[in-house]
Amino acid sequence: MSNAYKRVLLKLSGEALMGDDAFGINRATIERMVADIAEVVGLGTQLAVVIGGGNIFRGVAGGAAGMDRATADYMGMLATMMNALALQDAMRHAGIVARVQSALRMDQVVEPYIRPRAIRQLEEGKVVIFAAGTGNPFFTTDTAAALRGSEVGAEVVLKATKVDGVYSADPKKDPSATRYTTISFDEAISRNLQVMDATAFALCRDQKLPIRVFSINKPGALKRIVLGEDEGTLVHV
């Protein structure tokens, strides 16, 4: 079976790295994620990653607690840097060549984000991990995923979550919630579905960049998507 996508952008939430822990990075969880990524890389698909930082610090929560929102968001960007380094290290142990590019300069630790360099690294078969969101406060890492995906020419944004798609309501709170197989960006925005923020949806809609929402906890889901199988929910123009 041939690959459905040549280049994809994988959005990983920081919370997904916690596994069953309450905080931080669960090593077994990150190793399992890397095993899924290795399968996709082995198929020849070029993979970029945007990673969140909510397992360490959330800027929105900091702002709500009375901290200056911009300061809180910069702290959140630094949290994504920690996650990116952990993911890169796990990939190295799995034999995957990965590069971290940061929207905030931290030259002694990672490379700065340079679009042509990122594209070249993807073409060389390296995994490129984008850290520090967009580099600007008030923008989520979901928006960073939409932005970087558009910049590097990804064919789809793969949003890895703890649920297996987009639901009409929170399935944890509403047992009658139903899962969408497909949904348009406009409908997702008008229904205020919280799987991604409206800015990310709008950017992907304008760039005609589809989003597939799937469960990171479902074994083999990432590989099945790359092979073109129907997994999770497709958000489209």
From Swiss-Prot:
Major site of localization recorded for this protein: cytoplasm
Q: Superkingdom of this entry's organism?
A: Bacteria
Record Pfam families: AA_kinase (PF00696)
Q: Describe regulators of its activity.
A: Inhibited by UTP.
Please state what class of enzyme this protein is: transferase
Localization terms from the record:
Cytoplasm
- What is its pathway? Pyrimidine metabolism; CTP biosynthesis via de novo pathway; UDP from UMP (UMPK route): step 1/1
- Recorded coiled-coil stretches: none
**GO molecular function annotation:** ATP binding; UMP kinase activity
Q: Which reaction does it catalyse?
A: UMP + ATP = UDP + ADP
Q: Which GO terms describe its biological process?
A: 'de novo' CTP biosynthetic process; UDP biosynthetic process
List residues binding ATP.
Answer: 11-14, 54, 58, 161, 167, 170
EC annotation? 2.7.4.22
Any Gene Ontology CC annotation: cytosol
Q: Where does UMP bind?
A: 53, 73, 134-141
**The protein's assembly and partners:** Homohexamer.
| HAMAP family according to UniProt | PyrH_B
Record-stated family? Belongs to the UMP kinase family.
According to its UniProt entry, the function of this protein is described as:
Catalyzes the reversible phosphorylation of UMP to UDP.
Q: What NCBIfam families does the database record attribute to this sequence? A: pyrH_bact
Q: Which PANTHER family match?
A: URIDYLATE KINASE, URIDYLATE KINASE PUMPKIN, CHLOROPLASTIC
Q: What is this protein called?
A: Uridylate kinase
Q: Output the lineage of the source organism.
A: Bacteria, Pseudomonadati, Pseudomonadota, Betaproteobacteria, Burkholderiales
